[in-house]
Each structure stands twice: as structure tokens, then as C-alpha cells.
Amino acid sequence: MVMATGILALQGNFRQHAKSLELINKEYTFIKNSNDIENIDSLILPGGESTSMIKIQENEEIFNKLLNKINEGIPTLGTCAGLILLSNDVLDGKVSLGILNCVVERNAYGRQNDSFEGLVTFNKNTQMYCFIRAPR
């Protein structure tokens, strides 16, 4: 059986992570229910809206299987809301998986409507970049 990276795909930017894995020819599977967790060898908890992501804990089966896999030691990446899910101390009191020994402040750099796109010039090259609010 081929092992794959599991990408939590309940909400958020899971498709962008899949595109990155495709670039390096890494097998992946989207985790949408607890059965999808069985055959993964690494895990990505993507960014998105952290309040929505935290709701995975309402589904104890997914929550417990994710915790078991992470506690077994599989490599795990959390970006933005995924980091919030992993942290053991969220300053605004939101519940998390409590795996990573860190303190996180949600929306520390502003709210959703504080995100913007802007032109940046570096080494005489100008490109459009997206600036998003993020946890700290």
C-alpha cells in the first residue's frame, strides 16, 4: 500500500498544499473523514479560518485519529490556522490539539479584512504579493 501525505481538507487552503506536493511528485490524500487518516506517513494542517478548523474537534473520531498519528511521530506541518490547531496555548482561549509547545495569538496582525495585495519591487523586479494577517 502506498503511503501518502494527509492534507486536512475540511476547510482552508488545502488545494494549494496539494499543488506543492504535486511539484515534488509526493503522493497525497485529502483528509475529509477519519478513514482517510489510516494510510498517511505525514500530515499537513493547512491555513484557513481557525475557528472553523477547530470545529474538527467536534468530530472526536477525526480528532483522536489525528492526535494518535501525531503522537506516533509522523512529520506534521501546520500553516497559519494549522499552527493554531497544533499549539498547546491559544491566547484567546480557543481549544486546540495541544501538541506543539508554543503560545499562539490568533489574528495578531489584524483581521481578515486587513489582508491586501500590493506591488513589491526587489532587485529591480516588481511583482504582486499577497499580505495576509496571521497568528503570532
Annotate the PLM regions.
Residues 1-59, 64-74, 121, 126:
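N-terminal beta1-alpha1 cap of cysteine-dependent amidohydrolase-like domains
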Residues 9, 101, 117, 133-134:
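Short, structured patches in soluble enzyme cores that scaffold and shape functional sites
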